[in-house]
């Protein structure tokens, strides 16, 4: 199979049929074999019933329904698990991403040899606040990752199948899939300017809470890519350093006390110096950081599968 197209769906009953028909038309015209995987992320507006109806008319349309809303990353991860096409393409379900971009994205993976191609919505039709926060966040993500993409959060991306089977997407980390792919060893990452449409139906799901969550997940993915396999490398090093600093401060006060005593001088109480309590506090914090790293190692080595979602039903899968 040439293509697997993964589409997270959350209360987009007005748009998903139009989007699906558009994708079918593009794939048919370009002689691409395909499957369309629609993951219903707990919709309550009849989106699932629409998916069932479309799947009944076309076996290439497949659906998966969560029991509740888990978020976009969960839907993408589940879609990746079901995908079997040589190239996997993700896009949003609100008709703001154009299926007409599919053939060129497919070509960039198959012919040009990219592992991942990210869309760049150079001309956007989003609310002003979303455009501003997006520029700020993309600049930070570029600086943190070293990946020269202009639009990390663009929903329209293409992947080699091996890429999506090698990464784990959770939280709000769908924004940072290029970073996860790079860390997994897939370094041929390209970018394509794509057409962006104004929202045709419904209202945007974007809010400032997603902006905050996105930044927190940027910190998370940065930590995971560097220390996820061995948190002791970070916490153990910091803990040991802080413990040694605190011990040195307390040790200095102790040695000074002994020198005074050896010279038969009246020595001040060790506990009368604020440095004693500062040193003691730093030692305690260092010990706690070390224990945090140790516990992180235990959890990392014994944790069960983190991406476990309750699936209510499937169709054509």
Give each language-model segment a name:
Residues 12-27:
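Short, well-formed alpha-helical segments that are part of the catalytic scaffolds
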Residues 60-68, 72-82, 87, 96-176, ...:
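Acceptor/aglycone-binding surface of glycosyltransferases and processive sugar-polymer synthases
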Residues 20, 32-43, 64-65:
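Short beta-strand/loop segment that forms part of the nucleotide-sugar
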Residues 40-49, 95-96:
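A conserved acidic beta->alpha catalytic loop
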Residues 2-4, 35:
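Cell-envelope/extracellular polymer assembly enzymes that use nucleotide-activated donors
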Residues 14-18, 45-54:
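Acidic helix N-cap motif at the loop->helix transition within catalytic regions
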Residues 179-317:
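Hydrophobic helical membrane-anchoring modules
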């Amino acid at each position: 199979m040439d293509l697997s197209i993964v589409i997270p769906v959350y209360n987009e009953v007005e748009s998903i049929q139009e989007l699906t028909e558009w994708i079918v038309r593009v794939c048919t015209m370009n002689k691409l074999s395909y499957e369309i995987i629609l993951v219903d992320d707990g919709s309550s507006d009849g989106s699932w019933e629409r998916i069932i109806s479309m799947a009944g008319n076309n076996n290439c349309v497949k659906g998966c329904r969560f029991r509740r809303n888990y978020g976009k990353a969960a839907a993408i991860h589940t879609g990746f698990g079901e995908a079997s096409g040589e190239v996997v393409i993700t896009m949003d379900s609100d008709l703001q991403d154009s299926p007409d971009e599919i053939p060129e994205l497919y070509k960039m993976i198959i012919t040009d040899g990219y592992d991942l191609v990210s869309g760049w919505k150079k001309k956007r039709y989003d609310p002003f606040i979303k455009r501003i926060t997006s520029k700020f966040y993309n600049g930070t993500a570029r600086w943190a990752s070293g990946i020269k993409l202009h639009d990390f959060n663009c929903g329209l991306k293409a992947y080699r199948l091996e890429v999506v089977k090698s990464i784990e997407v959770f939280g709000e980390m769908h924004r940072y899939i290029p970073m996860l792919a790079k860390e997994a060893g897939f370094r041929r990452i390209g970018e394509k300017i794509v057409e962006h449409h104004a929202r045709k139906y419904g209202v945007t799901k974007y809010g400032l809470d997603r902006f905050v969550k996105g930044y927190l997940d940027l910190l998370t993915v940065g930590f995971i890519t560097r220390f996820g396999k061995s948190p002791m490398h970070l916490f153990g090093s910091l803990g040991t350093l802080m413990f040694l600093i605190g011990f040195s401060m307390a040790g200095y006060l102790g040695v000074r006390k002994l020198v005074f005593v050896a010279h038969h001088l009246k020595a001040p109480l060790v506990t009368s110096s604020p440095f004693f309590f500062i040193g003691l506090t730093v030692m305690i914090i260092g010990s706690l950081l070390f224990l945090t790293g140790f516990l992180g190692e235990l959890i990392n080595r014994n944790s069960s599968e983190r991406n476990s979602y309750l699936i209510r039903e499937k169709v054509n899968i």
